Structures are given as C-alpha cells and as structure tokens.
Amino acid sequence: MLTDGYARFRETGFPRHEGAYRALAEGQEPPVMVISCCDSRVDPEAIFDAGPGELFVVRNVANLVPPCDPGGDYGTGAAIEFAVEGLGVADIVVMGHSGCGGIRAYIESRGAPPGESGAPGFIGKWISTVRGAEARLPTDAPSDGPGLQEAFEYASIRNSLDNLMTFPIVRQAVDDGRLRLHGAHFSIADGLLTVLDPATGNAAVPE
C-alpha cells in the first residue's frame, strides 16, 4: 500500500506541487497550527484542502493540550512553542472529532483517583487531561451513551483552548493580537465541521 501510494505521489502528486516543494525546501512559514487527533479517519490536510506547507499539524490521542507544566508532558508543549515562537503562526485550531476513542476511554474510566484515568499505560496517563473537561460539560448533558460522548468531545476542545492560554508565549501572543485560538469538531459520518464561537462557546457549521 505505501509503495503504491509513493509511486502515485511521484507520478502525479509531486509534479502538481513541485514549485511549492522547491520553495519549501528553503523553509516553512505555515500560517496555521492544527492540533488534531491521531485517529486515521481525521486528516486535517484533507479536511481543509491544504497543500504542502500550509498547515503545521500536531496529532495526538484525543487532540489534547495539557496545561503548561515545564516538568510535565512536553511533546505537545514543544510543538506549541515552536509554532508560536519559531514559525509565528497567526492561528491555532484545536480540532476534535466524532467517535473519539480517547474520549471514550476516559468516559469508561471515570471515577479514578485524581491524576489517574483508570485506563492502563501511557494512554491512561495521557487521557487524564480530559478530567479538566468535566467542569465544561453543559448542565443538560446526557448521563451516558452517544450524547455524553459528544458532549465530552466538545468540552474537551474547550478545555484544551483554556489550557493553551496557560502557556505564557500563547497568552502573550493572544494579548498582543498576533495569535487567535479556535475550536472545531469534525463529524466523520457526514464530513461536517462545526466551529466554536469564541465568545459564546456555541458550535455552528461555517457557511
């Protein structure tokens, strides 16, 4: 599969963007950072119809941004620092999606002690970040089932946006008007993207 895909890239993909690739060999200046889930069904470049060099994409389980902690999880934090300080991106988008396995794992393990998720291994430690989304659930959120899953997906996006603002470099860039933060949610079944209103937190499909 990979070999065949590379052959198609060399035959049609690279020639179509050859000029862009040659320019990008000198460096990158993507205007947008996207923090997305590593789920194979959610491809930011495809969803936003972006070409080479247009998006700086970071993917992790459940598209999470942990709070800034120099002694804690640093992978996503390093990417944020590089995007804001090194690349000077103007926008950061946290994009969740329907049927997120990381969110589902957190829901199934609720009730674990603080700082733990109840799930095993690295995944368990990582998704404990979702705990911060509990306070952002709407008061009328369903208590279980697909409705609770979706409510947590949106609440977790809002939580990650709040956590972004705990990074001093992000807060400074936002306060200076150099950086904007956005939340979005992709529905896999129908290909619809909903965007969170930064003022109200409400979600709507962009026109």
Regions found by a protein language model. Name each.
Residues 1-30, 53, 63-90, 101-207:
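Divalent-metal-activated hydrolytic enzyme cores
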Residues 25-44:
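N-terminal low-complexity or amphipathic/hydrophobic leaders
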Residues 35-37, 59, 93-97, 182-187:
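Short beta-strand segments
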Residues 39-41, 97-102:
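Gly/Ser/Thr-rich loops at beta-strand to alpha-helix junctions
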Residues 40-62:
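Catalytic core of membrane glycerolipid acyltransferases/transacylases, capturing the structured
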